[in-house]
């Protein structure tokens, strides 16, 4: 909704000092651009294709590109790995938008109702997500595609974050499909815990 490319600048600087190429991405958000979720997915996939297309310019190995993000940005990073639709018409589809690894910070991985969730979540999901996507909300929820082949994934979560349950379902389906998907939890922490203090250092 209100993401900014400055969110992970400190993390980018940390890895750049260690010889990695780190890029922050600006994408359209609903609070500033009156867009829907599938539009944001288009932007994320376009960004991945741009990085891969310009890999030689930046000294990047195009087969070793990780996508990372927090909260809604984590949702979009996951979408680049698991969703094959929602491509911008201007994109060169011959260039893969799929990352080779995922690093996700309290991502929204289950934004549509799933029968394994508590019944009270159904009403919450319908209320929060109604009208947020041009496509059916199931089509823009990473959990829908968790059982497909995907890159290795590490997910950081505070145990008090209500999004953790959806991530557990995502991990369950992903592992059943033979994918590597690990969740690292931090006791008593809520949403966005990694932004400052000791947990910023612990999640680097």
Predicted features by range, described:
Residues 162-168:
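Conserved alpha/beta-hydrolase "acid-adjacent" motif
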Residues 142-150, 166:
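Conserved serine/cysteine hydrolase catalytic core
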Residues 149, 154-157:
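Short beta-strand/loop motif that positions the catalytic acidic residue
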């Amino acid at each position: 909704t209100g993401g900014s490319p400055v969110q992970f600048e400190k993390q980018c600087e940390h890895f750049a000092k260690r010889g990695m190429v780190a890029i922050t991405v600006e994408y359209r958000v609903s609070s500033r651009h009156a867009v829907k979720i599938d539009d944001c997915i288009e932007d994320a996939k376009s960004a991945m294709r741009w990085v891969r297309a310009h890999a030689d310019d930046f000294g990047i190995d195009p087969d070793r590109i990780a996508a990372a993000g927090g909260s809604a940005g984590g949702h979009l990073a996951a979408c680049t790995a698991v969703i094959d639709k929602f491509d911008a018409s201007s994109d060169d589809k011959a260039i893969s938008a799929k990352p080779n690894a995922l690093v996700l910070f309290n991502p929204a991985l289950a934004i549509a109702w799933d029968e394994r969730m508590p019944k009270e979540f159904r009403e919450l999901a319908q209320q929060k997500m109604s009208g947020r996507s041009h496509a059916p909300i199931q089509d823009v929820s990473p959990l829908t595609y968790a059982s497909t082949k995907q890159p290795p994934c590490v997910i950081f979560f505070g145990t008090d974050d209500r999004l953790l349950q959806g991530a557990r379902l995502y991990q369950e389906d992903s592992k059943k499909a033979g994918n590597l998907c690990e969740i690292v939890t931090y006791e008593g922490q809520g949403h966005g815990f990694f932004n400052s203090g000791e947990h910023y250092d612990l999640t680097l």
